[in-house]
Structure formats: C-alpha cells, structure tokens
Amino acid sequence: MNPVPEEVIWCYGEWQLGYNQLKREGVIFTEGLPKVEEWSTNKRRLVILDDLMSETDDRVTKLFTKGSHHRNISVMYIVQN
C-alpha cells in the first residue's frame, strides 16, 4: 500500500489469540465499529473490519464511502465462512 498508513485499526467481532502478535507490532484493536467521525483527517489510516457481518448497517456503508473519501481512510472487509 502506497503511501503507507500511519495507523492500522483492526475492528473485530470476537477476540482471537492471533491478534496479540499484531498488537505488539502497533496495530490498534477495537471491538465493533469505530466512531470515525471523531478522527482527524490528517492521518492516513487503514481500517480492517473482521468478523463484523452482523454490523452491516449504515455505519459500514458510510465508512466505505464518505468516511474513506473525506477522512483519509482505506477500508478492508474480511469475510469468511
């Protein structure tokens, strides 16, 4: 990814032991969806949505559209069965 994000925020539905290594490497973890409207636009952020299929509401749509475009955010959505 270029330019490299200044922050990586991993949003999860259920904590997994594998997250501990990522946390040691500086990844920020939050349970559920973040309140991106509170974030400043001066940082490049990568937001990863993991295991949040039940959170498919208007906040997810805004994160992918207005949130990413106007707040300097790139979004990845991890979906697996």
Where are the model-predicted features located?
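Conserved P-loop NTPase motor cores
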Residues: M1-E6, C11-L17, R24-N81
